[in-house]
Design a protein with these regions (language model features):
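Short, solvent-exposed turn/loop segments enriched in Gly/Ser/Thr/Pro and often Arg
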Residues: 2-10, 68-73, 127-129, 165
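Solvent-exposed serine/threonine-rich low-complexity stretches and specific carbohydrate-binding patches
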Residues: 446-456
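Short, solvent-exposed loop/turn segments in extracellular or other extracytoplasmic domains
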Residues: 315-319, 460-465
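Aromatic, loop-rich ligand-recognition surfaces of beta-strand-rich domains
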Residues: 385-448, 462-508
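Short, compositionally stereotyped local motifs that mark structural "simplifiers"
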Residues: 251, 257-401, 420, 429
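Aromatic- and acidic-residue-enriched carbohydrate-binding clefts of CAZyme catalytic domains
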Residues: 8-47, 75-101
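Flexible, acidic glycine-rich loops studded with aromatic residues
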Residues: 122-138, 143-294
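Gly/Pro-rich turn-and-neighbor structural signature
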Residues: 50-54, 58-65, 69-141, 146-153, ...
Length: 508
C-alpha cells in the first residue's frame, strides 16, 4: 500500500514544497492523522505521486496496487490557494452530500487510478474513496464497517470486506485487557470473527458477485515483535479461514473450537505464541433489573469442570447461573481432566442505589467502546486504569447523559463515578458534571453541578474520581450529565473533541 494523498507527512518532511503550506514539516513520532497532506493543486506533487507509483510497479509485479485514500483531512485544501485554483479549474462544486474538497480528493484518486491502469495494473482504495466520485475501476476495501462495501457492490465495484469492528486483529480478543498485551482498543473476539458473514444483506445475486471476500489486518503500532503478531493472529486466523470456506448454514462454532483445541498440539510443537481465551471460561454478567440481581452465566467449550469461589468460602462446582445482589468477589476457573487449571477469572462487585436499575442514555457511546451498552454503568463492576477493558464506556464529541430509574422514591445525597484520563490518547477529564432529579421522569431539576479545570498535559494516565455531594433529596429519577473538553492548542488532537470514559455510576 502506498497511501495517498494523506498519511504523507514523512514525504512532506523530505519534500516540503509538495505540501500546501510549504512547511517546515516533521515526521511524526506516533501514529495518527495529520492535517498536512499532499497539495492536490500542485502539479509537481501529482508528478511525485506518479513517480513513486511507477517505481513501485517496477519493483512489485502484483496485479493490484493499494493507493489508500483514507483519513485525508480537508483543512489545508480549504485554505490553500493552489487547491482552490484547481477546484475552480476543474469546475468542481460541492453539494448537499459532499464538499468541493471531497470532490478534489476524488480527482486525485481518479487520476492515480488511471495512471496505474495505464500500466496494466488495478488499484485498491479504502472506503473513503466513496466520498465524492469513485474512480471507475477501483476496488474498494471496506474498513469502516460493512456499509462501504455494500455501497460499492451496489455500484458494481469489486469489494474486499475488512471491517475494523470484526477483522482488525490488532484489536483486543479478551475483555480482560489488564491481562493482555496493550492494543489500540476495540474488541474482536474469535467468535465474532467466526460468525461474521462477508456478504451483506440486501444485495442481489448479481451484486453479491462483487464481494471478492474478507481480509483481516494486523496494524503494528502496538505490535513490536513477530511473537506478538502470532498471538494476535492465532486462533483468529483459523476462524477467518473457516468463515471464508463455509456457507452460513454449515458453521458450527462449538465444533470448530474443539477442532482448534486439537490444533494447539501443532502450535506447541512449533513453539508458536497463541491466545488461549476460547479454551478458558466465558463469564457473561448481565444485570436483571426487573429482579434486582446480577446474573452470572459461566460456560466452557472444552472438557473439564467449572469451579467457582465467592469471597473466601469453599470452592464449589458450578451447575447453574449465579445470582449476585450484594458486595462480593467471584473467582472461577476450569479444572481439566488432565489435572491442569485454566485461567483464574475474578470479578469484584460493589453495589450502590443505582446498581441493577433501569438506565437510559440520551447519547450512545462510540461503537468502538460501547461493549455491553448502558448496563456497564450499573452492573456493580468497576474499571481499572486500562480503558479498553470493557468496563468503560467511551463518548466522543458528545455528552454522557444518563438517566437512572431508582424504581421508587429514594433518598440520595451523593453521586460519584470515575473517569479514565489518558491525555496522549485524547481522553480527558470532564469539563463539567451536573446532577438532576425528577419524580416523573419528565420534569428534571438540577441539584448539583461542578466545573473542572483541564488536567495538565503531563498528567500521568490514571483514574480521575468525580464526586458530587448535596443535601439529601427524595427522588425516583437521577440524571447525570458529563460534558467533555475539546483538545486544546498544542495537543495532537487540537481542533477535535476529546474522549470521556466512565465506568460505574454510583448513587448513595
Amino acid at each position: 500500500e502506498i497511501d495517498l494523498p494523506g498519511h504523507q507527512l514523512a514525504a512532506l518532511a523530505a519534500y516540503p514544497e509538495l505540501g500546501c503550506t510549504g512547511g517546515p514539516y516533521e515526521v511524526w513520532k506516533q501514529w495518527g492523522v495529520s492535517e498536512d497532506v499532499i497539495c492536490a493543486g500542485n502539479e509537481k506533487a501529482m508528478q511525485f505521486l506518479e513517480d513513486v507509483l511507477l517505481e513501485v510497479m517496477e519493483v512489485f509485479p502484483s496485479e493490484y496496487i493499494h493507493i489508500g485514500g483514507d483519513e485525508v483531512p480537508r483543512d489545508r485544501w480549504k485554505e490553500c490557494p493552489k487547491c482552490q485554483a484547481k477546484i475552480k479549474e476543474l469546475g468542481i462544486k460541492g453539494d448537499q452530500q459532499h464538499s468541493a474538497e471531497d470532490y478534489l480528493q476524488s480527482y486525485v484518486m481518479t487520476r492515480m487510478e488511471r495512471f496505474v491502469e495505464s500500466h496494466g495494473r488495478h488499484v485498491i482504495g479504502w472506503d473513503e474513496i466513496l466520498d465524492g466520485e469513485l474512480a471507475p475501476n477501483a476496488t474498494v476495501m471496506s474498513w469502516r464497517g460493512s456499509s462501504g462495501g455494500y455501497k460499492a457492490a451496489k455500484m458494481h465495484h469489486n469489494v474486499i470486506m475488512t471491517p475494523n469492528d470484526v477483522l482488525y486483529f490488532d484489536y483486543y480478543q479478551s475483555l480482560d485487557t489488564d491481562s493482555e498485551p496493550i492494543s489500540i482498543g476495540g474488541y474482536n473476539p474469535v467468535k465474532k470473527v467466526y460468525l461474521y458473514e462477508p456478504i451483506p444483506d440486501g444485495l442481489t445475486e448479481e451484486e453479491q458477485q462483487y464481494i471478492l471476500g474478507p481480509q483481516a489486518n494486523i496494524w503494528t503500532e502496538y505490535t513490536s515483535t513477530f511473537n506478538l503478531v502470532l498471538y494476535r493472529m492465532i486462533p483468529r486466523i483459523g476462524a477467518l479461514a473457516e468463515m471464508q470456506w463455509c456457507l452460513p448454514e454449515q458453521k458450527d462454532y462449538e465444533n470448530w473450537v474443539l477442532r482448534e483445541y486439537r490444533m494447539t498440539k501443532l502450535y506447541d510443537l512449533y513453539d508458536w505464541n497463541y491466545a488461549k481465551h476460547i479454551f478458558d471460561l466465558e463469564v457473561k454478567i448481565t444485570p436483571v433489573v426487573e429482579e434486582g440481581f446480577i446474573n452470572v452465566n459461566i460456560s466452557k467449550l472444552v472438557d473439564g469442570d467449572i469451579v467457582y469461589v465467592i469471597d473466601d468460602k469453599a470452592p464449589l462446582r458450578y451447575t447453574e447461573p449465579l445470582h449476585i445482589n450484594s458486595d462480593c468477589t467471584l473467582s472461577c476457573y476450569i479444572s481439566r481432566s488432565d489435572g491442569t487449571r485454566g485461567k483464574l477469572i475474578k470479578s469484584e462487585f460493589r453495589f450502590s442505589k443505582a446498581s441493577m436499575k433501569p438506565i437510559t442514555l440520551k447519547n450512545q457511546p462510540n461503537k468502538q467502546y460501547a461493549y455491553d451498552g448502558a448496563q456497564v454503568l450499573i452492573d456493580g463492576l468497576h474499571g481499572h486504569t486500562n480503558y479498553r477493558s470493557g468496563r468503560w464506556l467511551g463518548w466522543y464529541g458528545t455528552d454522557l447523559d444518563a438517566t437512572i430509574d431508582l424504581n421508587e422514591p429514594t433518598e440520595i445525597s451523593q453521586v460519584k463515578f470515575n473517569l479514565n484520563v489518558n491525555m496522549k490518547d485524547w481522553i480527558f477529564n470532564a469539563k463539567s458534571v451536573k446532577v438532576l432529579v425528577s419524580d416523573d421522569g419528565i420534569d428534571f431539576k438540577e441539584i448539583a453541578s461542578k466545573d473542572y479545570d483541564m488536567v495538565p498535559a503531563d498528567y500521568i494516565p490514571d483514574l480521575y474520581p468525580v464526586e458530587l455531594e448535596f443535601e439529601p433529596v427524595t427522588t425516583r429519577y437521577v440524571e447525570v450529565v458529563v460534558t467533555p473538553y475539546d483538545c486544546p492548542k498544542g495537543h495532537t488532537g487540537y481542533g477535535y473533541p476529546a474522549w470521556i470514559f466512565v465506568d460505574e455510576i454510583e448513587v448513595y
